[in-house]
């Protein structure tokens, strides 16, 4: 399993609209082969920041499968205008330690 991680900085005053847009965008990513799940959590210390975790079977399921699809174009239209700055997305492999 691959874990995708991004810290999303949402423009001030846009959190409620972002959360609504994110909920409406979930079916777009969920329809991707190799998609295993997603969580978007609000930061408790910094208003307007969110942590996105998405789980994928493979890196390619995200990079080629989702980002290469027409569903990603709609995802971008719904969500990308909320971010300032645009988030850096990283992908992580299997854990080296867990408890």
Report the location of each language-model feature.
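Short hydrophobic/aromatic beta-strand micro-patches
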Residues: 9, 53-55
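Glycine-rich beta-strand-turn "strand-cap" elements at beta-sheet edges
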Residues: 2, 39-46, 51, 74-99
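An amphipathic, aromatic/His-enriched active-site/gating alpha helix that lines ligand/cofactor pockets
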Residues: 27-36, 55-90
């Amino acid at each position: 399993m691959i874990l995708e991680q991004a810290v999303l900085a949402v423009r001030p005053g846009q959190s409620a609209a972002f959360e609504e847009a994110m909920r409406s965008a979930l079916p777009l990513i969920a329809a991707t082969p190799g998609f295993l799940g997603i969580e978007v959590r609000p930061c408790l210390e910094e208003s307007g920041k969110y942590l996105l975790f998405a789980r994928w079977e493979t890196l390619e399921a995200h990079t080629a499968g989702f980002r290469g699809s027409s569903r990603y174009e709609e995802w971008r239209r719904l969500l990308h205008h909320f971010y300032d700055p645009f988030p850096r997305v990283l992908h992580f492999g299997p854990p080296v330690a867990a408890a």
